[in-house]
Amino acid sequence: MTDYKNTLNLPETGFPMRGDLAKREPAMLQNWHDKKLYQKIREASKGKRSFILHDGPPYANGNIHLGHAVNHILKDIINKSKTAMGFDTPYVPGWDCHGLPIELKVEGLVGKPNENISASEFRQKCREYAKEQVDGQKADFMRLGILGDWDNPYLTMNFDTEAHIIRTLGKVIANGHLYKGSKPVHWCLDCGSSLAEAEVEYEDKVSPSIYVRFSAVDPVAVEAKFNAQGKGSGQISAVIWTTTPWTLPSNRAIALNSELEYQLVQFGDERVILATELVEAVQKVTGVEQVEVLGSAKGSDLELMRFNHPFYDFSVPFILGDHVTTDGGTGLVHTAPDHGLDDYIVGQKYKLEMAGLVANDGKFISTTPFFAGKGVFETNDLVLEKLKETGALLKLERIKHSYPHCWRHKTPIIFRATPQWFIGMETQGLRKQALGEIKRVRWIPSWGEARIDTMVANRPDWCISRQRTWGVPMTMFVHNETEQLHPRTLEILEEVAKRVEQAGIQAWWDLDPKEVLGEEDAKIYRKVPDTLDVWFDSGSTYASVVQQRPEFNGNSADMYLEGSDQHRGWFMSSLMLSTATDNKAPYNQVLTHGFTVDEKGRKMSKSLGNVIVPSEVWNKNGADILRLWVASTDYTGEIAVSHNILNSAGDTYRRIRNTARFLLANLNGFDPKRDLVKPEEMIALDRWAVSCALDAQNDIKEAYDNYQFHTVVQRLMRFCSIEMGSFYLDIIKDRQYTTKADSLARRSCQTALWHISEALVRWIAPILSFTADEIWGYLPQVEGRSEFVFTEEFYTDLFGLSESDKLDDNYWQKLLKVRAEVNRVLEQARNDKLIGAALEAKVTVYANDDIRPLLEQLGNELGFVLITSQAIVKPLAEADVAEGELAGLAVKVERADGEKCPRCWHYATDIGANAEHAEICGRCVENVVGEGETRNFA
């Protein structure tokens, strides 16, 4: 028996079936590093349109978590897809390196500055610690396959960056946005410092809920205002409600709404003043049964009436404020200008005293009656005792409510007035201009615009000063008596910035004021001891990084991309500073993604045991699986992840890899320069396959352009699984394996596979970067080919069907449906044990007048499309079987005629017709020793 195996064109490739990504990826990374891949991309992109995705700096503390991985993978997908679209996409990764978390870590190692170690040594230790953290995170980001200038990242602690942060402060001052004020700010007792809006979290807290009496100084005058002379009996009191009893020592007024109606009410054996709308609610809370309205008055008529403080020997006025509502409480608001923003604002209007009773450590100062030296929260109970003692406590409850907490310490914070430096939202029209700039930016998803618009519209002035050791100093001098900035402040800032550029921020702390002020001014001006809020550091990177790095060529950022929490963080601080200094937003587009949750929608937490660490994934599955999971998910909402979800991503990966392997294996022996077939000479099915790839590419490019990466993956899977896997690649196996190696039938097919491979590898490169790099190395080599797929643009040699193609896309789509119906009937026959493999079948397709001409066009090649040994087409009227699931079609399956050919596995009736090759069918004889069979369609 002759062995015809060596007459077949069997698929062959060194491209492995298994990805083994965890093992192979590190070697690829090393190759990228050794070959300077990032620099090669920059060189290949010179002169092209730029696209700048500016990296929001992660904080240089701790290992990267899954959220970091999601963020940087999304950025990398965008940069690589933009490169493939013909853009120059320089990417400079960065890190946020100053601030309290690093201070706390270093304190744990070496102790507090100025206690266990000098401040200058402490700063150096902070710098060293931050550098270690950056190096660790950098290695992790690189392991994810993210390309960027990792050798030259930006760090906010780089000397030149620190200098430019100081210069940005100078611009803020020059444009009139900075002022000093004693204003209530979020204050963390554990940090010993003010907090930015973005550093505040809200958690549930149990607090005392109290109703407090302020007795009237002149009860007769009160009766007159309410037109209730001589009515009722007992003491007259204004009743306030609060959940912060410790702020009562700082009370300096009671606020009413000028438009609300208030009533004087007989409340048991006393008389109280309440907002009309809240009388019933307060009665219910206090349990007072006897209630009678004695008179009413408008808030505006009660202004400046005075009431006695509940335990101090002074009285406070009624004042009017728009912030007073009837959403809860009594409609009369306890006002302590030191401890609330609304209180402060209305207090400024009425020139109320700022009591200043609470020190930096959260304890009452030594001159505070009754509470000196006590912490604010322990004072709550002491105040309650005092209120009971004076008879001022009307009602006490305990409630659970949402309360601001420090994001680092997870402890309750307070509002506290301290002397701080602010960027004014109303000065020079900053708020109005920022709101206008928001409208100019493209927000992705679109709801981001309304979110940041509301935040900017309602945000307070930005407190940019901090009382910390490790931070960029506010390099200013103020007058010892007037507290005014030195008249040469801008000049001094630039002089100090130059020194910082050479020696870092320590240059400021080491600076003798006489060096920049002269002998006389140094006597009357002192250094500002504060450092800048770290949000100022990162918020000014549009100036300290984007405007400085040569690869950006002076262009502003096209995109900022971070988690959705950054509307109130980095997006906000960047917008405020850029508008204040440059009169424009620092970005053209802002894209946000959601947070990672488990498959049940729960946050990642150690206590739930659902935390997935990125390194565990790449060590087990490979970084490409992590990248594919990120790309497959709609990042605009919460991003679900679990081991099951990652396994599903692995299944998707295998489908793509198997498709690539089939393509590569069947390009064995193909030399594009020698063997490429012109489109007009290609077989109809092959031309259609290339046109399918063109359609897929157009969809994929559009999805990349719209940052819809899950759509890219879905379209890719449709192409690999439906159009290719279950149709085209299945059909061509016979032609690939059995026709003459150099025949038009085979070379036409290989030409299609070549074009498809060249396109496919570019489609997946932004997402499956390691796998694309691997595929690139196994593709048939052509002259002038780039060493790496990442320097290439999307493939441009795909082509669509021409108008002269009778078998257009509509034709092949109908044929796909016919084939699906035939496969359904074949599967039934297989289940009925009539046949085993499809090639054991002869099918008779009974078709109506619409479908039959389509099938008849293929002639004897219909069997190759249906992958049956014989296929006959007859009118539907002749059918002796019922119509199936496709209207107008009935399919009859019988055992194929003839014997099985050992070479092509088709059943044929002409086996033995050729004496020299009696074992194989006539078609195989033609392909082995003749001119080779002719194919026109499939």
Swiss-Prot record:
Its EC number is 6.1.1.5. Zn(2+) binds at C901, C904, C921, C924. The keyword Protein biosynthesis applies. IleRS has two distinct active sites: one for aminoacylation and one for editing. The misactivated valine is translocated from the active site to the editing site, which sterically excludes the correctly activated isoleucine. The single editing site contains two valyl binding pockets, one specific for each substrate (Val-AMP or Val-tRNA(Ile)). Its main location: cytoplasm. Monomer. Binds 1 zinc ion per subunit. GO terms for cellular component: cytosol. HAMAP family: Ile_tRNA_synth_type1. It comes from Glaesserella parasuis serovar 5 (strain SH0165) (Haemophilus parasuis). Belongs to the class-I aminoacyl-tRNA synthetase family. IleS type 1 subfamily. Gene3D superfamilies: 1.10.730.20, HUPs (3.40.50.620), Valyl/Leucyl/Isoleucyl-tRNA synthetase, editing domain (3.90.740.10). Disulfide bonds: none annotated. Coiled coil: none annotated. It catalyses: tRNA(Ile) + L-isoleucine + ATP = L-isoleucyl-tRNA(Ile) + AMP + diphosphate. The keyword ATP-binding applies. The gene is ileS. This is Isoleucine--tRNA ligase. It is found in: Cytoplasm. A motif ('KMSKS' region) lies at residues 603-607. GO terms for biological process: isoleucyl-tRNA aminoacylation. Its cofactor is Zn(2+).
